[in-house]
């Protein structure tokens, strides 16, 4: 395999959203509980990011931001990127694409350049472009049974509808995904092996997780085991080991900063 590029980039992202996944499996969590579980996860997660000095991109629902304005302002002030995860996580209207961007920009004081559709659902990129975004991060170019099949889509950053499309990383040949469920359920040694293959091939890696994963989810027994365990501190320790290893191989950067630094190269290769 080829050697690692001199400066690998780690694009770390979190979907900062309501903890509504139990309701997909028959629960009836109210809105405040959904928000509080995510807050609990953020309390666990943020000290780790501070310790590692790891800037991340937080794809944030405008609803969460409106209920947690000081936290979102603090994220922006700490050097993290605030991007849009639409208005709500559980329901969608086309007008939410623009409205969420305006709300998040107003709260964070940052330009909001990026969009990620909840549950990585398909989205008309013309709508994303018209709402003023410069990139879309709604693509996981793999096959996830019951959710989506994007095996024919490009694996790495590409241009479409005058937008940058920022896929989540998958391995070069088999397209094994490196998203949150894989990280939660597979051995760290295997995740590192797959990550190394991506870094050697692509020169960067794009990852996404959820803050609520780092809260205590033991009581949500209606969730499938593979989405619920490990969680809390146990999962945080695994994430810590993984991120420290990635830091030894490269540097953390936001999605917008990666595009800014590599735009000429990306345009040439698109």
Regions found by a protein language model. Give the residues of each.
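Short catalytic/ligand-binding loop motif for oxyanion handling, primarily in non-cytosolic enzymes
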Residues: 20-21, 65-68, 91, 123-126, ...
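Conserved, mostly hydrophobic/aromatic
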Residues: 15, 49, 58, 85, ...
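Active-site beta->alpha N-cap acidic-glycine motif
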Residues: 2-78
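Metal-dependent polysaccharide deacetylase catalytic core of the NodB/CE4 family, i.e.
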Residues: 52-124, 133, 138-139, 170-172
């Amino acid at each position: 395999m080829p050697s690692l590029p001199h400066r690998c980039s780690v694009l770390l992202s979190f979907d900062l959203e309501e903890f509504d996944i139990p309701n997909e499996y028959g629960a009836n969590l109210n809105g405040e509980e959904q928000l509080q579980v995510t807050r609990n996860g953020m309390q666990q997660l943020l000290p780790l990011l501070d310790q590692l000095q790891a800037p991340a991109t937080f794809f944030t629902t405008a609803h969460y931001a409106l209920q947690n304005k000081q936290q979102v302002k603090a994220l922006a002030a700490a050097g993290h990127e605030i991007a849009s995860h639409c208005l709500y996580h559980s329901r969608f209207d086309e007008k939410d694409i623009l409205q969420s961007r305006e709300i998040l920009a107003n709260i964070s004081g940052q330009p909001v350049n990026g969009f990620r559709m909840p549950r990585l659902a398909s989205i008309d990129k013309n709508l994303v472009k018209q709402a003023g975004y410069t990139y879309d991060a709604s693509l996981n170019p793999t096959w996830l049974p019951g959710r989506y099949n994007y095996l024919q889509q490009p694996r790495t950053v590409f241009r479409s509808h005058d937008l940058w499309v920022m896929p989540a990383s998958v391995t070069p040949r088999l397209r094994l995904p490196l998203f949150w469920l894989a990280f939660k359920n597979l051995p760290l040694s295997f995740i590192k092996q797959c990550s190394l293959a991506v870094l050697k091939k692509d020169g960067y890696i794009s990852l996404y997780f959820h803050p609520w994963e780092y809260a205590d989810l033991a009581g949500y027994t209606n969730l499938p085991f593979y989405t619920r365990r490990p969680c809390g501190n146990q999962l945080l320790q695994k994430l810590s080991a993984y991120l420290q290893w990635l830091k030894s191989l490269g540097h953390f950067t936001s999605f917008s900063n990666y595009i800014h630094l590599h735009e000429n190269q990306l345009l040439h290769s698109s």
